[in-house]
Amino acid sequence: MGTDSRAAKALLARARTLHLQTGNLLNWGRLRKKCPSTHSEELHDCIQKTLNEWSSQINPDLVREFPDVLECTVSHAVEKINPDEREEMKVSAKLFIVESNSSSSTRSAVDMACSVLGVAQLDSVIIASPPIEDGVNLSLEHLQPYWEELENLVQSKKIVAIGTSDLDKTQLEQLYQWAQVKPNSNQVNLASCCVMPPDLTAFAKQFDIQLLTHNDPKELLSEASFQEALQESIPDIQAHEWVPLWLLRYSVIVKSRGIIKSKGYILQAKRRGS
């Protein structure tokens, strides 16, 4: 094991929380040697390479301090939005909750995304369906704690618009009727339905909800896949001790031209028992 791995292993053995951010993937250059075939493959690659890059540049002072929170990033890829250009950009995010016991993850993720990008608010946040036990159908009760956090963030002007993912007509209608801040969009996975369901289309049209498509897997990041990436990047680490809480994928689009200026991932993980 090299010095880099030893330092990273020592820090991760003492830290309680890990914040990992890829920076703008369009700035990765040599780090992006291949074009991943799926979102899961891209994410695994990003986590692994971010950890590798971070561990190769650890400041010796950090090892003496042993901070509770580790900020793991690809420093040369970090890119904040120029305040003078903010009005020309649309900043969108999709939030994936991995650890279902933490509704406060929503606020943590949005706050961190704003900080990373240097903005006061996000234009749009879509929340993926929270994790539920196998054999259990998603209900309004599963969504409510996360949606309430999103509503608070809209009311405090941290987010402009909020949306959902993979809700059928009944689920979307229940959320719409209950929510104070209504969903303005719902993503549909075309892998599971080649044509938009007519009842969902009719309901969305009636209440001015935009129907979007996506091709994310049901579970973009699992505890096992995160631990695998951690183990591959930093050998001999106690990877099973680390649990991802949430993952946020963002994109910054130039409104007038419809081109992506920036995209990346941010995630938070905690060590068990901390």
Curated annotation (Swiss-Prot):
Q: Does the keyword section mention Transit peptide?
A: no
Keywords tagged on the record: Acetylation, Glutathione biosynthesis
What do the Gene Ontology cellular component annotations say? cytosol; glutamate-cysteine ligase complex
UniProt similarity note: Belongs to the aldo/keto reductase family. Glutamate--cysteine ligase light chain subfamily.
Question: What does UniProt note about where in the body, tissue by tissue, this protein is expressed?
Answer: In all tissues examined. Highest levels in skeletal muscle.
Q: Which organism is it from?
A: Homo sapiens (Human)
Protein name per its UniProtKB record: Glutamate--cysteine ligase regulatory subunit
Return one GO MF term: glutamate-cysteine ligase activity
In terms of InterPro entries, this protein maps to: Gclm, NADP_OxRdtase_dom, NADP_OxRdtase_dom_sf
Q: Which GO terms describe its biological process?
A: apoptotic mitochondrial changes; blood vessel diameter maintenance; cellular response to fibroblast growth factor stimulus; cellular response to follicle-stimulating hormone stimulus; cellular response to glucose stimulus; cellular response to hepatocyte growth factor stimulus; cellular response to leukemia inhibitory factor; cellular response to thyroxine stimulus
